[in-house]
Amino acid sequence: MDLGIQGKNALVCAASKGLGRGCAEALAEAGVNLTICARTEKDIVDTANEIRSKYKVSVESIACDITTSEGREAALKTSGPVDILINNAGGPPPGQFRDWTREDWIKALDANMLTAIELIKSTVDEMISRKFGRIINITSAAVKSPISILGLSNGARMGLTGFCAGIARD
């Protein structure tokens, strides 16, 4: 099936395994050139090599912590213009809300909401100027049906979902 995205450029976060890797492989199969990132260099390099050998697309990899400004800057510098942004991050640990500190909340919001917002801010204007862009935020089914022990994740991911629903109306 032709998705009309062949030759486009995607930045896929947390792409060495799981949903991020699945997205990277599906995009590569559709002919999209990739920049993939993850924290562990060996894992992301191995993933890039495997995708590169299987599909006829360009695959750049960078080991970085996308939740830091330095990590985001490095990923964006490596990627060049981004046509497709896949925001993806692992979730915070489960637990009981009475046990979570303010720092736990800040860390969850930073990883699962604010990082994605910063990446959107860094890419959306170029997408608009090129009259093409796709932003996919991988969150959780818990944004529709919250799970009590996943309060940190519920809050951060619902925040991102609500933010994006608002800006989509711009």
Where are these regions (language model features)?
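Conserved glycine-rich cofactor-binding loop
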Residues: 9, 16-18
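Substrate-binding pocket helix/loop in short-chain dehydrogenase/reductase
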Residues: 96-98, 104-109
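Catalytic loop of short-chain dehydrogenase/reductase
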Residues: 136-159, 164-169
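Conserved glycine-rich Rossmann-like NAD(P)H-binding loop of the short-chain dehydrogenase/reductase
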Residues: 32-46
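Conserved NAD(P)H cofactor-binding loop of Rossmann-fold oxidoreductase domains
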Residues: 88-93
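A short, exposed helix-loop element centered on a Lys and neighboring polar residues
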Residues: 120-121, 165
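Alpha-helical segment proximal to the catalytic Tyr-Lys
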Residues: 125, 169-170
